[in-house]
A protein has these predicted regions:
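NAD(P)+-binding Rossmann beta1-loop-alpha1 motif at the extreme N-terminus of oxidoreductases
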Residues: 1-47, 51
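Rossmann-like NAD(P)-binding element
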Residues: 39-77
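Solvent-exposed alpha-helices and their adjacent loops that cap or buttress functional pockets
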Residues: 45, 113-116, 209-214
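Rossmann-fold dinucleotide-binding core
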Residues: 56, 66-67, 75-77, 83-158, ...
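Interdomain hinge/lid region at the active-site interface
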Residues: 157-161, 171-233
Length: 234
């Protein structure tokens, strides 16, 4: 019998732990000790760790923290669910012999458990790493037991960029454009909704004129995620 370890019990880690613990022995770990179920950690202490699921925030100490967690739990594979700077997975892979997988998380934090099952869970691992094929198969099987669909990408950096460029940042730019178009509407004393109604049929037929609503760009990961690209000098 083996266990799963989820490191970081925040808005992503907690739902992932709840999801996994229904199909496998699993423990949660966090720097905030009040969030840890110490009895469960003791219960599964001697169980070897299959996957170490990383759900901690991305900081300058992110890689060092993962290396430390790897030494602590000695998993057969590391799975990163956090949003990270491009090439982070590869940098970590050079510092460990176990496969390091990236699996971007999609969903709204307040309904994350529901969204984890609604969206396909993309993942990627360097195919040249020893046991990469095993890791991909085992992760897919684990997610299947959790009733989560999976899809494998060719390499980690493609998925790292997809999460930032195609998901959160793209959403933020759409809202930014809505803010700009709203400013133009106000300056010219025209109705924002009436102006945008011109695009309704275009979007209906072509699907490429989405109307967003101006205002504060909510979601504490939308704007900060733009910084990840800058850090990587992409």
């Amino acid at each position: 019998m083996e266990k799963q370890v989820v490191a970081g019990l925040g808005e992503i880690g907690r739902p992932i732990l709840e999801l996994i613990m229904k199909v496998s022995p699993a423990i949660g770990y966090d720097i905030e000790e009040s969030l840890i179920d110490k009895e469960k950690i003791k219960k599964y202490e001697k169980y070897p760790t299959t996957f170490l699921h990383i759900c901690i925030p991305f900081t300058e100490k992110f890689i060092a923290n993962i290396i430390s967690l790897n030494k602590k739990f000695k998993p057969k594979c590391i799975v990163i669910h956090s949003t990270i700077s491009p090439n982070t997975t590869t940098k970590i892979q050079t510092q460990t012999d176990v496969p390091v997988m990236y699996s971007a998380t999609r969903g709204v934090h307040k309904r994350m458990l529901f969204d984890l099952r609604r969206y396909t869970k993309f993942f990627a691992v360097d195919p040249n790493v020893p046991n990469a094929t095993w890791a991909a198969k085992e992760f897919s099987n684990l997610m299947k037991k959790c009733k989560v669909k999976t899809k494998q990408m060719s390499n980690p950096i493609t998925l790292e960029l997809a999460k930032i460029v195609v998901d959160t940042s793209y959403y933020g730019w759409l809202i930014t454009y809505a803010q700009l178009s709203n400013m133009i509407a106000i300056q010219n004393n025209v109705n924002y909704d009436e102006m945008w109604s011109f695009a309704d049929e275009i979007h209906k037929f072509l699907g490429n004129r989405p109307k967003m609503f101006p205002g504060f760009i909510g979601g504490h990961c939308v704007i900060p995620n733009l910084d990840q690209i800058g850090r990587a000098h992409v």
